Amino acid sequence: MGKEDKTHINVVVIGHVDSGKSTTTGHLIYKCGGIDKRTIEKFEKEAAELGKGSFKYAWVLDKLKAERERGITIDIALWKFETPKYYVTVIDAPGHRDFIKNMITGTSQADCAILIIAAGTGEFEAGISKDGQTREHALLAYTLGVKQLIVAINKMDTTQWSQTRFEEIIKETKNFIKKVGYNPAGVAFVPISGFNGDNMLEPSTNCPWYKGWEKETKAGKATGKTLLEAIDAIEPPKRPTDKPLRLPLQDVYKIGGIGTVPVGRIETGVLKPGMVVTFAPSNVTTEVKSVEMHHEQLAQGVPGDNVGFNVKNVSVKDIRRGNVAGDSKNDPPAGAASFTAQVIVLNHPGQVGAGYAPVLDCHTAHIACKFAELLEKIDRRTGKAVEASPKFIKSGDAAIVKMIPSKPMCVEAFTDYPPLGRFAVRDMRQTVAVGVIKAVDKSTAAAGKVTKSAAKAAKK
């Protein structure tokens, strides 16, 4: 396979804080990834000097995390690794304060979650206990539309590669993920040691009893032995090129001699020079003169591309971060007067009732929204109503809520445009709830500004 032919996929790694996520992820990146030998040697030397030699894979990841948290934008290639079939990007590993927010507003939707579970006595039980973080992360992944899952049973060396322990854990984990919403038949369960490397890239000789994993896919049965093969067996995502254009703006630049250049990531549809786009909720329509990525002109931009595009006769004052660009002739975006959403309260110290007005982070928009009405309390797993018009909801509850943005904002139903249909509720400097938008009441805005070039282009 040529280098260019590989599909890009995104994975998110979840699991309890001591499950060995960093070591396992570090190992994959280390062995098949974008870290050059020089950097590895430097890290190894530092780790040895600090007496952390045994910790080298996690150390690699810790170095990357520390640099990222200090705001040094390290080369993102460091979070990538290759399998025979895919280029894999690790979006984020939890434990990071903003993990939940990143997962929701994150630049990318994960195609698959890798759940790492520690096999050690007591460790496994702690990881999936009632209040376990693991449960929260798995539920979040499922709620946010990450429908594929791989389970890696880590630290098998601490159980002397016990087959009974492995089978006991699988039985429990199957029940656990079923409660979350996943179908265990479609999940690969792999016994590994992220630290020693067993069953990571090569089949281990330590578990002769292990015959390999198998899972059902749309195409039939898939089998394999290693974690790498399980990642390779992820079903390739369908990128939404056929949907109408949605491009949330990250920034708008004014570039001398060129003019106004909005920048953002195409979430759905395609963007081509000559197209007439509408920005919502600003309600400005204009023609796209050129599209570029990494300083190269593109004939068209597709979902996943971070592009800059030059628009005619629009000032930097007209459009801003959080606006969404779409095709003026194909379901153009519009501001939302109100919307209903399924909201899950994660950690709020008190009760949440009508009138609560926290800030919502949805795609690139960051806007206060009022919980206007709690319509019904629902069972998180089934989505069925358990109480009509509750007075309050608290941590752990899920409800259907009618929300009203404090100023115009552009959102969409999750089923139509997933990245514009999920949000994080931020309050007290943390994510207190997450939501998935069910329906949007689009404000019928008065006719907006249409530039001359757009009017001309429309006549063509």
Swiss-Prot record:
Disulfide bonds: none annotated. InterPro entries: EFTu-like_2 (IPR004161), G_TR_CS (IPR031157), GTP-eEF1A_C (IPR054696), P-loop_NTPase (IPR027417), T_Tr_GTP-bd_dom (IPR000795), TRAFAC_GTPase_members (IPR050100), Transl_B-barrel_sf (IPR009000), Transl_elong_EF1A/Init_IF2_C (IPR009001). GTP binds at residues 15-22, 92-96, 154-157. The modification N6,N6-dimethyllysine is found at K3, K317. The gene is tef-1. It is found in: Cytoplasm. GO terms for biological process: translation; translational elongation. This protein promotes the GTP-dependent binding of aminoacyl-tRNA to the A-site of ribosomes during protein biosynthesis. The modification N,N,N-trimethylglycine is found at G2. This is Elongation factor 1-alpha. Residues 193-195 are annotated as: G5. The modification N6-methyllysine is found at K3, K31, K317, K391. GO terms for molecular function: GTP binding; GTPase activity; translation elongation factor activity. Belongs to the TRAFAC class translation factor GTPase superfamily. Classic translation factor GTPase family. EF-Tu/EF-1A subfamily. Pfam families: GTP-eEF1A_C (PF22594), GTP_EFTU (PF00009), GTP_EFTU_D2 (PF03144). Residues 154-157 are annotated as: G4. Residues 15-22 are annotated as: G1. Residues 92-95 are annotated as: G3. Residues 71-75 are annotated as: G2. The lineage of its organism: Eukaryota, Fungi, Dikarya, Ascomycota, Pezizomycotina. Keywords: Cytoplasm, Elongation factor, GTP-binding, Methylation, Nucleotide-binding, Protein biosynthesis.
